[in-house]
């Protein structure tokens, strides 16, 4: 218990910072950063530095954890939970801590750029819209007068809004009627219903 209360996070436990990556980095980016860092601090290049071996081992451990999807998910879960214990302790306690702390985990940070799939669909939709506009602009029948003639020749031509007895008026207008319940005067039936008389 004292170890948890007196825990101070070390910089070497943040594997993303150690490798110079971000939480959203791909495995390829992580491996590329590992290669750069490993070349800088390889023990063979610095035989006089006693910490070179330790640093290189930390880099290898960070690469192994972050390049494996399952261990990376566990590491991200531990990192976002901000638990007062090392990642090794977290792994040793396995499910007991994770079960009781499922609510305390922060969510993954948002992407700064949209996904390529989403961008592609938006671009395709915009192309279709612009093509439709060009077709309408190039169409000689797209003038307002011609459009009115086409509408009058449509199946609803027998229906006129001025003639309420014409067949199909209710069908034609059903999507266009907007009721304002607050402005309507309550009927006797509604009054009885509200007063529990029905």
From Swiss-Prot:
Q: Write down any Gene Ontology CC term.
A: cytoplasm
Its keywords, alphabetically, are:
Acetylation, Chaperone, Cytoplasm, Phosphoprotein
Q: What does this protein do?
A: Probable co-chaperone that participates in the proper folding of biopterin-dependent aromatic amino acid hydroxylases, which include phenylalanine-4-hydroxylase (PAH), tyrosine 3-monooxygenase (TH) and peripheral and neuronal tryptophan hydroxylases (TPH1 and TPH2).
| Residues found modified as Phosphoserine | 160, 166, 182
Q: Which InterPro entries match?
A: DnaJ_domain, J_dom_sf, JDP1-like
Q: Determine the domain of life of the protein's source.
A: Eukaryota
Q: Which organism is it from?
A: Rattus norvegicus (Rat)
Query: Hey, what's the signal peptide range on this chain?
Result: none
Coiled coil ranges (UniProt) are: none
The protein in question is named DnaJ homolog subfamily C member 12
